[in-house]
Amino acid sequence: MNEALGTLISQAGTIANDARQVFGGLSTQQLNWKPAPDRWSVGQCFDHLMTTNSGYLPVIDDVLQGRKKSSVWQKLPFMPRLWGKLLIKSLDPSQARKIKAPKAFEPAQSDISGSIINDFVAQQSQVMEKMKATENLDLERIVITSPAATPVTYSLMDAYRIIVVHERRHFQQAQRVIETSGFPAGN
C-alpha cells in the first residue's frame, strides 16, 4: 500500500477511536450544548463532518466503478494541485482563522441525535474502506471535483488529506466545547 495512503487511513482510524473515547459517553444534552448561540455543539461538529464526508462517498464510488467523468475544471493545468494545497493548509487545525462552512455542509440546527458519535464512527469505517479500495490507483493523478464547489478540483489523494485534516480540525473544536466553562456535567 502507498505509504501516504496508509498513514491517512491510520489517522482516520485514530480519529474514529478518539471520537468514541472522548465523546462516545456524552448524553444527548451534552452533545447538543452550545457554548454560545453562534457556536457549534459537539453534535453539530460531527453532524457537519458526516454531511461533508457523505459528499465524497459517491465520488469515490464513481472512481472505483470507472464512472468518473472529467469536468472542464478538472482539466485546467495546475488548478487541482493549487486547490488541494490551499484547502489542506486552510483546514489545518493549527490555523486560527475560522472558515465558514458552505451552506450545503452546515450542521443541523435542531437537536442532534444521541447516536451521532456511533454514526460518525460507522461512516468513518466506510470512508476508510473506500480509501483502502483505491490503494492500487494513481491517487495523485485522479482529479475529482469538490463536493462543496464545482470549480474546485484536487487529486483524490488530496481529497483524502482534506478529509483527515478537516476531521482533526472539528475534533479539536468539539474538544474545546467540552472544555468550556458551563459545559453540563455528566449524569
Give the role of each language-model region.
Residues L5-G6, G43, S113-G114, A159-Y160:
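Active-site rim elements
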Residues L82-L139:
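Acidic/histidine-rich alpha-helical segments that form the ligand environment
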Residues Q29-K34:
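AMP-dependent adenylate-forming
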Residues M1-L5, Q109, A149-L156:
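A short, mixed-charge helix-start or loop-turn motif at secondary-structure junctions
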Residues M1-N17:
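Extreme N-terminal tail/first-helix region
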Residues G25-S27, T134:
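Short secondary-structure junctions
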Residues P35-I88, S125-A133, L137-N187:
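Short, contiguous alpha-helical
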Residues I15, A19-V22, Y56, F120-Q123, ...:
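Amphipathic alpha-helices that form helix-helix packing interfaces
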